[in-house]
């Protein structure tokens, strides 16, 4: 996920977490450009360990002032419910709503252009196929005779899915979040997305929502939408877990609410979108530039990193392509600003290149080198990996089948992207026979005695006494 007009991604593990100040990057600029797409350049062999470590730091997001804005919204929605959501929708979206929530079952089928419908149908099928394959069979293990243990799977009963509006419509995010919820069997699925100026919802988002089993649509965005799903209102069901992207205010609301009395969890912390591209001399400069820009265009806070692996790479051709393509993009101004705080790294070989990538832990990792598949085993930290010259990051964003809600800000070191598991919970079950308790009980009683927990010990020994009495009789 990312703080962009689109998918959101990880940034802070708890509402109490504020990112530490970023270490300054080494001032070893090897090349500059007067183009709209200038990127700083560094050679790893010339940097100290501290300087290399500084390159992994992301631009800092200061949530202190944002919390001051979001907290009153969270509390207002808690107290006034639908009325507060309507007021904030007028204030921020300039829309006066009659109804905040609509039931998807009450909506008519959505008519789309045939080519658009086919594209989303293909995406749905691929996303469904990949996520349904993640189902695991239940297994029962008999650890010792008469002692059986297993883990059973249950869905999270109610979930909230946030699909941003902003400067771009994102029906792809509706699929990425709703399809695994559908497979998991979540009974209540609330999709929140900002309404357009006439109070309607993007028809492509509605099509995807209906196809993927969404039950309710909340016509609201921002912190007020997150708050409505977390607290519940007269018209909006309360959810148990909230997923999805958003701007800094959406992220702040998720951070605040996950440790509040609302008792709601969130998918992951979130920060700006990012990509790291590893390219060797065989990579097509046109493709490399396009991949860098596909992330940079998300917004000025996005970050792109180019890692040049080995000798023979025509960096000048890549820079020229970046400048050429950037100037032709409708969102070129966003891309240019993002490139202004992005950078290029020179690695002596692929081992050093992937080692740097593992330290950086990117949301998206593109390995555009000859025989890319052979390097997969070295990858330790990345949200999603794209191997080879024919695998642009865009396919993962839309329709290859993998999920595009991914950890950013370096959280790929310890977080995974959204998957079927994100919508499931696992419950352990144990069942002992009389023989099983006779075998295991004395050991449990002894451990309880060591820990000084007499009631624990007696829960076992009293049963063992009953067993012995039965045997004696």
Swiss-Prot record:
The keyword Zinc appears for this protein: yes
Enzyme class: oxidoreductase
Binding sites annotated in the UniProt record for substrate: 273, 295, 298, 364, 397, 451, 456
A Pfam family per the record: Histidinol_dh
InterPro entries reported in the protein's UniProt record: Ald_DH/histidinol_DH (IPR016161), Histidinol_DH_CS (IPR001692), Histidinol_DH_monofunct (IPR022695), Hstdl_DH (IPR012131)
Residue ranges of the region described as Disordered: 1-28
Positions of the catalytic residues: 363 (proton acceptor), 364 (proton acceptor)
Subcellular localization: Plastid, Chloroplast
UniProt keyword list: Amino-acid biosynthesis, Chloroplast, Histidine biosynthesis, Metal-binding, NAD, Oxidoreductase, Plastid, Transit peptide, Zinc
Co-factor remark: Binds 1 zinc ion per subunit.
Molecular function as annotated in GO: histidinol dehydrogenase activity; metal ion binding; NAD binding
PROSITE patterns hit by this protein: HISOL_DEHYDROGENASE
Function field: Catalyzes the sequential NAD-dependent oxidations of L-histidinol to L-histidinaldehyde and then to L-histidine.
HAMAP family in UniProt: HisD
Name under which the protein is recorded: Histidinol dehydrogenase, chloroplastic
Organism, scientific name: Oryza sativa subsp. japonica (Rice)
Lineage: Eukaryota, Viridiplantae, Streptophyta, Embryophyta, Tracheophyta
Gene: HDH
């Amino acid at each position: 996920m990312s703080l962009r007009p689109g998918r959101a991604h990880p940034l802070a593990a708890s509402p109490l977490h504020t990112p530490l100040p970023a270490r300054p990057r080494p001032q070893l600029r090897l090349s500059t450009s007067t183009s709209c797409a200038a990127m700083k350049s560094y050679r790893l062999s010339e940097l100290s360990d501290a300087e290399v470590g500084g390159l992994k730091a992301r631009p800092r997001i200061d949530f202190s002032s944002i919390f001051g804005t979001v907290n009153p919204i969270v509390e207002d929605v808690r107290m006034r419910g639908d009325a507060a959501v309507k007021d904030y929708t007028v204030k921020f979206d300039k829309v006066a709503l009659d109804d905040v929530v609509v039931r998807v079952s009450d909506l008519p089928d959505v008519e789309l252009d045939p080519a658009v419908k086919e594209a989303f149908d293909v995406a749905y099928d691929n996303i469904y196929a990949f996520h349904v394959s993640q189902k695991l069979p239940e297994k029962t293990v008999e650890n010792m005779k008469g002692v059986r243990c297993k883990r059973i799977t249950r869905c999270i009963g109610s979930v909230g899915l946030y699909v941003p509006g902003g400067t771009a419509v994102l029906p792809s995010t509706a699929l990425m979040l709703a399809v695994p919820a559908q497979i998991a069997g979540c009974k209540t699925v609330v999709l929140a997305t900002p309404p357009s100026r006439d109070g309607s919802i993007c028809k492509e988002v509605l099509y995807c929502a209906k196809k993927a089993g969404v039950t309710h649509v909340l016509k609201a965005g921002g912190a007020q939408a997150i708050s409505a799903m977390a607290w519940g209102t007269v018209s909006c069901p309360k959810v148990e877990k909230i997923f999805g992207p958003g701007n800094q205010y959406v992220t702040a609301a998720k951070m605040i609410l996950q440790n509040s009395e609302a008792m709601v969890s969130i998918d992951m912390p979130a920060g700006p979108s990012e990509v790291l591209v590893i390219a060797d001399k065989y990579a097509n400069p046109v493709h490399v530039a396009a991949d860098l820009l596909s992330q940079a265009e998300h917004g000025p806070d996005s970050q792109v990193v180019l890692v040049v692996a080995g000798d023979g790479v025509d960096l000048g051709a890549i820079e020229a392509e970046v400048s050429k393509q950037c100037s032709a993009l409708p969102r070129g101004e966003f891309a240019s600003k993002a490139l202004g705080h992005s950078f290029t790294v020179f690695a002596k070989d692929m081992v050093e290149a992937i080692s740097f990538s593992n330290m950086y832990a990117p949301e998206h990792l593109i390995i555009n080198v000859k025989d890319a598949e052979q390097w997969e085993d070295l990858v330790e930290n990345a949200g999603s990996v794209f191997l080879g010259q024919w695998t642009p990051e865009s396919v993962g964003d839309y329709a290859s089948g993998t999920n595009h809600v991914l950890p950013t800000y370096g959280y790929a070191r310890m977080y995974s992207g959204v998957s079927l598991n994100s919508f499931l919970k696992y419950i352990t079950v144990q069942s002992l026979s009389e023989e099983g308790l006779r075998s295991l009980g004395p050991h449990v009683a002894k451990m309880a005695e060591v820990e000084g927990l007499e009631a624990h010990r007696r829960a076992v020994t009293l049963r063992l006494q009953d067993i012995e009495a039965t045997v004696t009789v």
